[in-house]
Amino acid sequence: VRGPLTKEQLEKMGYIVPDIYGDPAILLPLIYNPNVEKKYKYSVIPQFVVEKDFRERFHAENIISMNTNNYKQVIDNIKASEIVFTSSLHGIILAESYNVPAVFFRGLSKSVDFKYYDYYLSTGRPDIKIADTFEEAKKMSPLSIPDLTKLQQGLLDSFPYDLWEYKFWNKWQ
């Protein structure tokens, strides 16, 4: 599960949930991690549901769209940034997974969901700083980037490789 808040909710429903946290996106650097030179002072990743409105209202140096299938381009642009300002949960997760500082802002959506707190708690950061606007975010310092190694290893160790091999690979052999 993503974090302790999800675990708590599932346990209330009667499920047994191990203390293994992490969004699968934290594993991407283990799969795709090119060397990319920094070329942007900052980049902005708006939450996908407000991206169009954000682009119309703000002129940022580099706006990265999460509305794409080209994950390599997204990652390359994040890695090319000195810092990321984002209202997207996966903008935060990807930036931090690639050791790029991220500042979280509510943006046009104005909501802060359970899932954001769940992610931050999974990384050992109960006190998060949230900017209300992009302009406010640019004045803030990012939180320290967490060491995601233990979370990554927990996800890898808990993967049901035996089921994967049996159900999927044996069908095509």
Task: Give the predicted meaning of each segment.
Residues 1-173:
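Active-site anion-handling motifs in enzyme catalytic cores
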